[in-house]
Amino acid sequence: AIGEMLLGLNASHMLQYEIPVAGVATDVVGLFNHDNFARSLPETKMVLSAMLQSGKHSAAAYGRWVSSYETTRPVSASAAAQGFTQDIDSMFTVDLQYNYTFDFNSEDDLKLTLGVKNAFDEEVPQVYDAANWSYDPKHHDPRGRMISVGLKLTM
């Protein structure tokens, strides 16, 4: 037998979120919401996971997706010339992790973890409304691919 495999899906899809804008109930789902108190609200976010454990080895992969959304702020001519639009693209990233547990005796062990976040170095979508025309920190991480190594000693 290969081991134990677990598959998972955690998803949310907002159908509607109305707030008062100038006295009128307005649905703000799928918008960046630069001109009201609501935060940016993509319609859908999800995480797909796959984990495999076999003896001292375990591995996991996570696919993270944020749907596209848009800003209602008009794009200036200078911003449009730089390629900005009202659209904020969707983003999909993959995180990978591998663990190996070294057993020293019946009570002590050492776990080695190797990880990669954003394994394919996906760039965040640009947002015209964001500070300095950058990105939306509520839904996107601009740091690119990150590699990690961890050790955990249990005694």
Regions found by a protein language model. Name each.
Residues 2, 89, 105-107:
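A cross-taxa feature marking solvent-exposed loop/turn segments within ectodomains of secreted
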Residues 40, 51, 88, 104, ...:
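Generic marker of residues within folded, mature protein domains
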Residues 42-46, 90-94, 108, 143-147:
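Residues that define the transmembrane beta-barrel architecture of outer-membrane proteins
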Residues 63, 72-97:
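Generic long, charged, amphipathic alpha-helical segments
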